[in-house]
């Protein structure tokens, strides 16, 4: 029997999954309310939206935008990966595929946000 434990990437993936589901649960209902109801029905002054866009160009705003875009994708890909396993759909190297897509998405979003 080996005394050294096997290394795993699961703690990192579960951290990103947990962050993604938390961000989705806390912020997305507010975004749907604002962008889906209040803004289209004219209940929000358009001047406030211009100020919000200005905030998103600041370093703190860019960080918030990264959090709102990246972490939910990690959560979704983790759910899809394990959901396919639960439905007995086994894809060779599915972890590499799904988490690799999340890494690619992360790089693309970082590039897009920091080029604003």
UniProtKB/Swiss-Prot annotation:
Its main location: membrane. One of its GO terms (molecular function) is succinate dehydrogenase activity. The chain crosses the membrane at residues 24-44, 52-72, 96-116. It is found in: Cell inner membrane. Keywords: Cell inner membrane, Cell membrane, Membrane, Transmembrane, Transmembrane helix. Part of an enzyme complex containing four subunits: a flavoprotein (FrdA), an iron-sulfur protein (FrdB), and two hydrophobic anchor proteins (FrdC and FrdD). Belongs to the FrdD family. This is Fumarate reductase subunit D. It comes from Pasteurella multocida (strain Pm70). The gene is frdD.
């Amino acid at each position: 029997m080996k005394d050294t434990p096997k290394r795993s990437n699961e703690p990192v993936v579960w951290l990103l999954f947990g962050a993604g589901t938390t961000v989705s649960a806390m912020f997305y209902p507010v975004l749907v309310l604002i962008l889906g109801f209040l803004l289209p029905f004219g209940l929000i002054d358009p001047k406030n939206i211009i100020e919000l866009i200005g905030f998103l160009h600041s370093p703190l705003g860019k960080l918030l935008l990264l959090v709102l875009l990246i972490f939910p994708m990690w959560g979704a890909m983790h759910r899809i990966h394990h959901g396919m396993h639960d439905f007995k759909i086994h894809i060779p190297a599915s972890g590499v595929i799904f988490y690799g897509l999340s890494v690619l998405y992360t790089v693309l979003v970082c590039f897009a946000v920091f080029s604003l």
